[in-house]
Amino acid sequence: MEHSVSIRGLKIRYLEKGKGAPVVLLHGFSFCAETWVEIGLFDELAKEYHVYSFDMPYGIKSRSDKFDAKSRDEYAEFLNDLLKTLNINEPILLGASISGEVTLRYLLSGYSAKAGIVIGPVNVKSLAPNLNRITVPLLVVWGERDDISSPDNSKILESHVRNTEVHILKEAGHACYMDKPKEFKIIVKDFLKKA
């Protein structure tokens, strides 16, 4: 279940489980690969999908080698290299916070993906002029009380990305998946059935 791979000379740790279409889980800045295990999403999805959860090189709790990218686009390129190395084709990407932004940048770069799921992504306004280039289905989940990235940003995504589904979790903060794990899992599983 736990593996590591070398990408650009960096050791990247990841969890892997299940069979089926690939789903890639990417944590926020203050978290790690186990975040998705802790809320039960990793094991729940592994019943129907081939699930990967990466310790990204920017996570505070990540046990992967770290690097500071010159831009967030470089993290999207790094993610593409990681997926190519592991032969993960047409994944559904799920990214929270910084990883939500990285997911959006990955999709904007035209890299291979079946769909995207972003949770409270940061820096949405700076991406707005190009968001209409995203052509895959996009699920947007926000905590109503997110004080890091305003839930109003969901309107930007909804108005710029053609095939977007938005859910705002009541009484939840930036890490809404931690505050409301049961509701979050239902939303994600329903979206995956349609993607």
Language-model region placement:
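Conserved acidic catalytic loop of the alpha/beta-hydrolase fold
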Residues: 74-90
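Conserved alpha/beta-hydrolase
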Residues: 45-63
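Acidic catalytic loop of the alpha/beta-hydrolase fold
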Residues: 145-149
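Gly/Ala-rich beta-loop-alpha elbow adjacent to hydrolase catalytic centers
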Residues: 95-103
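The serine-hydrolase catalytic nucleophile loop
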Residues: 30-41
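Catalytic histidine-centered segment of alpha/beta-hydrolase-like enzymes
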Residues: 172-181
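A conserved short beta-strand
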Residues: 112-123
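Short beta-strand/loop motif that positions the catalytic acidic residue
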Residues: 134, 140-142
